[in-house]
Swiss-Prot record:
Homotetramer. GO terms for molecular function: argininosuccinate synthase activity; ATP binding. ATP binds at residues 11-19, 40, 122. This is Argininosuccinate synthase. The keyword Lipid metabolism does not apply. The lineage of its organism: Bacteria, Pseudomonadati, Pseudomonadota, Gammaproteobacteria, Alteromonadales. L-citrulline binds at residues 92, 97, 128, 132, 181, 190, 266, 278.
Amino acid sequence: MTQTVKKVVVAYSGGLDTSVILPWLQENYDNCEIVALFVADVGQGAEELEGIEAKALASGASECYVVDLKDELVENYIYPTLKTGAVYEGTYLLGTSMARQSIAKAQVEIARKVGADALCHGCTGKGNDQIRFESCFAALAPELTVIAPWRIWDLTSRESLLEYLAERDIPTAASGTKIYSRDANAWHISHEGGELEDPWNQPSKQVWTMTVDPIDAPNEPEFLTISVVKGEITAVNGEEMYLIIRYTYLNEKAAAHGVGRVDIVENRLVGMKSRGCYETPGGTVMVEALRGIEELVLDKITRKWKHTVAAEFSHLVYDGRWFTPLCASLLAAAGTLAEEMNGEVIVKMYKGSVQAVQKQSPNSLYSEEFATFGDDNVYDDQSHAEGFIRLYSLSSRIKALASK
């Protein structure tokens, strides 16, 4: 390789790709004296992290840092994004997108700590994640060299990766029979590949790993009371819980009712469409609860603007632009609007659906006196509406007259 690298920090998962990256780096970067491994615990599950440090060191790493990012992910990425109302293309709750940027930031911090001069990720050249990682690297550590093996090496398939390890007698638990590509964190789990690559195929039962099939969910609905303070979920059924515990609790409750499944074809940043199945049970409940409060407290023009911001912010997050001035500005604006978002929502979970069925807020703009269809003494002269309608429709009237 033409690059001179002395020390590199690898975003290491212990999976097949990054297991190959370690020996590949050692073989292709002669001056790479130390490979420092960074493992992010974003809530993917204890089974995925078990023995990972020993595996990294046995594969040639001089150091291995296992960093717990669960609280960081929920507090500094998920909750702020919830305040914006961002949902990519109306469906995707951005679980992988947020996690990648939290990992990239922590990876840069480890690189600075150990004095590394390079960063390495295992993202493919066809996906969004390479852009997310490297956009964050550019914003946070533009002086560091970035190594993206998938864009360099001649290994092109899962089989070739397995062959590479076998030739070097490097053990791996991976096999050539893997069906799905999955990504899990504290917010969600995603599923891609296999029969899902044909959008005419329905997802089989083995695709879903987190939520109960709605058909098999309980025949009785379950209700949860969600407390909201300044746009943040603070308690469930009156019980305040630590942030990650609260979300884990909602995940378990909603998953048992089959809530949070989506099957979408999304527009990737790299230009192609891809199909993915996502499970975000707790997040789906939170989005619905916040929507209920938003309906009560935001006036029409503010809510319309917020929806515009939500759409734009979803693209910023999806595209890996968390560490940009625009992202910071939109987060600040959403935080200001959230000051009024206080109250309680009762959500109903049943057979894969969640619905806000009761809501109240001390900042509510809803007035039963004005809204009633019965007798009222508030809007006592309905003829006042005539002047408004004439002005409101004036442009249409002028257009019609001009067309004659």
